[in-house]
């Protein structure tokens, strides 16, 4: 897996694409970038309490269907402050089909699989299927699909190669008829669909506007994100699609645009500057800079015994156990957490890239563990609470194909253990 630092401010000239909400700025949420990997992440949803993120990942060997699996649902849990757990596959609700994450609501996850709409309740006790419904006469000529459920949970918008397609993937809507049945797919028509691909539809909160990704309109890259307004209740007449602009779209490809009006969080997936296929990015949308979340949150979530965290902001110079200056903020965060939780011990795992001599890399990784250990001890943590081991380049997060990926492989992972 890959962990990338993301922290910058995007100034936007009040694009009106959220209806009546004027956009003044977007602020990157750096801590959540660690869910990304060398594969394809999309459909990123953060729960109401902002301590879980659920998303889709495709073509990961750890998917139920392996590297040919078009989509499994994964999750990551916020442990404390800016640290999130390594993503895990939600095996209990995935299979070898394309398991499309349509949305979340409270403790429920809504997943679409081969015409079925399944709602799962997620608790500490486990995952339970609480509702099963289906789209009438559902048909798709391929296993490639995307989409989402409306905020009122009465509509599903999908991208599929289905009835009356104008191209490859078109946009469709299905309306909820009762607790067990959804209407057959309604093609959104030629005013929005092209002979190319329209994908990843997402409805505004009032269901009057659809955001989607397409390579059928002029844009900045391969796929750009657009929006279009519904003109009537037929769902077949739409305004001319408008590009969201180069503050979101790039020379790469962007998709799976999502806006949570409750948390004011925007997410989308982009191939720009991604080490993997496409990475999820998260931003706070704020009407006033004074409303930005504080960076010194002190509410800690419970941590599980044996929980592993990748220190995604602790890096080393190549061929050295010297820490980069950017590393100290996160190490101080670890110190504060250990200081607040005296019942925890930690085991440090040191890793290098796999460039050069394997024996020297193994030795170097051990020295990196000692560097982190020494720093925490110097700050005041009892040395008996810290242990560790170096693994050299045996366990890369991602393939060592570039200098940026090499940097991510030169890392330390930390495992928390409870002593009582």
Task: Go through each PLM region and give its residues.
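Sec-dependent N-terminal signal peptides
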Residues: 4-14
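Solvent-exposed, polar/charged alpha-helical surfaces in well-ordered, non-transmembrane soluble domains
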Residues: 88, 186, 329-336, 346, ...
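Periplasmic OmpA-like peptidoglycan-binding domain that tethers envelope proteins to the cell wall
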Residues: 322, 349-420
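Periplasmic peptidoglycan-binding/tethering modules of Gram-negative envelope proteins
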Residues: 285-345, 419-420
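Sec/Tat signal peptide C-region and signal peptidase I cleavage site
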Residues: 15-19
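Short, conserved micro-motifs composed of acidic
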Residues: 20-310, 326, 370
């Amino acid at each position: 897996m890959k962990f990338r630092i993301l922290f910058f401010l995007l100034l936007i000239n009040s694009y009106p694409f959220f209806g009546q909400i004027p956009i003044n700025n977007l602020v990157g949420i750096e801590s959540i970038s660690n869910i990304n990997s060398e594969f394809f992440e999309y459909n990123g949803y953060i729960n109401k309490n902002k301590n879980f993120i659920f998303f889709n990942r495709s073509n990961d060997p750890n998917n139920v269907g392996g590297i040919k699996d078009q989509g499994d649902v994964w999750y990551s849990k916020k442990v404390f402050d800016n640290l999130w757990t390594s993503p895990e596959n939600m095996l209990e609700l995935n299979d070898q089909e394309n398991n499309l994450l349509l949305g979340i609501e409270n403790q429920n996850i809504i997943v679409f699989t081969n015409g079925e709409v399944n709602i799962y309740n997620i608790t500490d006790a486990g995952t339970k299927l609480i509702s099963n419904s289906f789209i009438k006469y559902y048909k798709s000529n391929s296993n490639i699909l995307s989409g989402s459920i409306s905020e009122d949970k009465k509509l599903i918008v999908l991208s599929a190669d289905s009835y009356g397609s104008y191209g490859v993937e078109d946009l469709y809507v299905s309306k909820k008829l009762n607790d067990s049945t959804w209407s057959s797919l309604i093609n959104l028509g030629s005013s929005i669909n092209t002979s190319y691909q329209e994908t990843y539809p997402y409805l505004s909160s009032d269901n009057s506007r659809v955001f989607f990704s397409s390579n059928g309109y002029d844009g900045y890259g391969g796929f750009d994100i657009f929006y279009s307004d519904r003109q009537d209740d037929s769902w077949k007449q739409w305004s001319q699609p408008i590009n969201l602009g180069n503050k979101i779209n790039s020379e790469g490809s962007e998709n799976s645009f999502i806006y949570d009006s409750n948390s004011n969080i925007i997410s989308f997936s982009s191939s720009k500057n991604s080490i993997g296929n496409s990475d999820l990015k998260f931003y706070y949308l704020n009407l006033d800079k004074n409303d930005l979340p504080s960076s010194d949150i002190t509410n800690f979530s419970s941590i599980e015994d044996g929980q592993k965290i990748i220190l995604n902001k602790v890096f080393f110079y190549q061929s050295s156990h010297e820490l980069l200056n950017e590393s100290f903020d996160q190490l101080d965060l670890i110190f504060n957490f250990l200081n607040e939780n005296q019942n925890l011990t930690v085991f440090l795992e040191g890793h290098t890239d796999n460039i050069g001599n394997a024996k020297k890399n193994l030795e170097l990784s051990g020295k990196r563990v000692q560097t982190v250990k020494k720093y925490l001890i110097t700050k005041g943590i009892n040395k008996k609470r810290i242990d560790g081991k170096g693994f050299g380049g045996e366990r890369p997060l991602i393939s060592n194909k570039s200098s940026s990926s090499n940097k991510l492989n030169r890392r330390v992972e930390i495992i928390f253990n409870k002593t009582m």
